[in-house]
């Protein structure tokens, strides 16, 4: 089995929902409990044995590039997307050629990873990976375990654990935030 040793960290967003804080600072550098949001994910990745992380940048990119230059683990490569905001899927597709077809993690830079100290969430995700049976593995959280989330959720799980997308009252898919 091939475990992921590389991650993509999505950090290019405009941070509109956190304005005015993000008018002068990219959202991944906003501190939560004294620690920039991006470090929560990068530290979790390093703890799970991830060696390389590609971070895409766009909005206030120089600040992120300067900040990330001080990290040693995981090793950071920058995907500079200042010329065109690619959104999440575009940011992933843009760096796929660098990954050589191997499994990888994708994390949003504006989330923080907490969990059981004995088995952090990212480690649980890594340990659940089975490339002989999976093409993708998505970590979700029950609403009562989601930190700082007050919505109705994005998915429901059937009895076999398969996820189905929640729909709003009109039948349209709800916005995904994972």
Question: At which residue positions do the language-model features occur?
Answer:
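Conserved N-terminal catalytic core of the sugar/cofactor nucleotidyltransferase
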Residues: 1-9, 17, 31, 35-108, ...
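The conserved beta1-alpha1 loop
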Residues: 12
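Glycine-rich "HGGG/HGxG" loop immediately N-terminal to the catalytic nucleophile
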Residues: 15-17, 132
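Conserved catalytic-core motifs of eukaryotic protein kinase domains, centered on the activation segment
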Residues: 20-23
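Conserved core of the sugar-phosphate nucleotidyltransferase
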Residues: 76, 114-178
């Amino acid at each position: 089995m091939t475990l992921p040793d590389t991650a993509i960290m999505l950090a290019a967003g405009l941070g509109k929902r956190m304005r005015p804080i993000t008018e002068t600072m990219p959202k991944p550098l906003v501190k939560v409990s004294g620690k920039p949001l991006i470090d929560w994910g990068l530290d979790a990745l390093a703890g799970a044995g991830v060696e390389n992380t590609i971070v895409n940048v766009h909005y206030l990119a120089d600040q992120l590039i300067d900040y990330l230059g001080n990290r040693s683990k995981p090793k950071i490569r920058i995907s500079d997307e200042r010329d065109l905001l690619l959104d999440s899927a575009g940011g992933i597709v843009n760096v796929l050629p660098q990954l050589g077809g191997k499994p990888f993690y994708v994390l949003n830079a504006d989330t923080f990873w907490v969990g059981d100290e004995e088995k952090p969430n990212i480690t649980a995700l890594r340990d659940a990976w089975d490339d002989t049976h999976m093409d993708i593995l998505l970590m979700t959280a029950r609403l009562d375990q989601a930190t700082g989330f007050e919505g109705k959720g994005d998915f429901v799980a059937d009895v076999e654990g398969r996820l189905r997308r929640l729909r709003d009252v009109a039948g349209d898919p709800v916005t995904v935030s994972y």
